[in-house]
UniProtKB/Swiss-Prot annotation:
Localisation: Cytoplasm
Similarity remark: Belongs to the GHMP kinase family. Homoserine kinase subfamily.
Name of the gene encoding the protein in the UniProt record: thrB
Protein name (database record): Homoserine kinase
Catalytic reaction annotation: L-homoserine + ATP = O-phospho-L-homoserine + ADP + H(+)
Lineage summary: Bacteria, Bacillati, Cyanobacteriota, Cyanophyceae, Synechococcales
Listed InterPro entries: GHMP_kinase_C_dom, GHMP_kinase_C_sf, GHMP_kinase_N_dom, GHMP_knse_ATP-bd_CS, Homoserine_kinase, Ribosomal_Su5_D2-typ_SF, Ribsml_uS5_D2-typ_fold_subgr
Amino acid sequence: MAQPSIGQKIVVDVPSTTANLGPGFDCLGAALDLNNRFAMRRIEGDSGRFELIIEGNEGSHLRGGPNNLIYRAAQRVWKAAGLEPVGLEAKVRLAVPPARGLGSSASAIVAGLVGANALVGEPLSKEKLLELAIDIEGHPDNVVPSLLGGLCLTAKAASQRWRVVRCVWINSVKVVVAIPSIRLSTSEARRAMPKDIPISDAVENLGALTLLLQGLRTGNGDLITDGMHDRLHEPYRWPLIKGGLDVRDAALNAGAWGCAISGAGPSVLALCPEDKGQAVSQAMVKAWEAEGVASRAPLLSIQTGGSHWQPQIEDE
């Protein structure tokens, strides 16, 4: 695509993501068909100028300025391409609020990278954008599926190079994500975890991960059930989520194959067959309602296309 001129807008669509999927702590994540939209354009003026416009109530507390995560990511693109930074405006419509465990920071990073790259003629490859995204976020399990889409397993090889494996997620396995009104910051969730874990817990997680990946590939519910167990972070984070265990149990009783904390929480994810989706959704919302917590629980599929941009024809 041709490089947009100053004032011309592009639209970047970035999927929400779920990470730490089951036993895949800090390595396994998936893109959900719940997109965040970023309308972006170059603006005249100071190269450090960043204007942020939030549409709707989600993320209304976010602010612009040069320290905003979108703009910081954009600056990394321009630096890597050997270009001078430019002023930027972003009009943002979030599908889910921040601090819910659905990759809001990853969405901001990927939007900044993809949008900034597009606005200067796409000098960087998707592989380079992926490298920058992981470096900015500090871990790969949200930013990789946010950029690439699908189910992604990411690990650092002995060579210190990040390796990404696109795994198969059969379409018959659906996702219900119960998104509560309460917040939980990633930093708070990280602090709850111990610095060291028993080797038996690590071994159990490795085995569960292989079962889960096979279950998602084949649609085998029994394998998903046996694989959706974690010993590395969930035992320490469930107590931080008001009513979280009740929500999990309600989903399982309604027919879900397995449940997990989405990301660092507080959202709770359930995997189920499509014909159980509505029952699982209603049960999870009702369980949180019993704790005085408002929530919604959409039935979702995996988004396979990842992030993409296009010229904006008219204001939306």
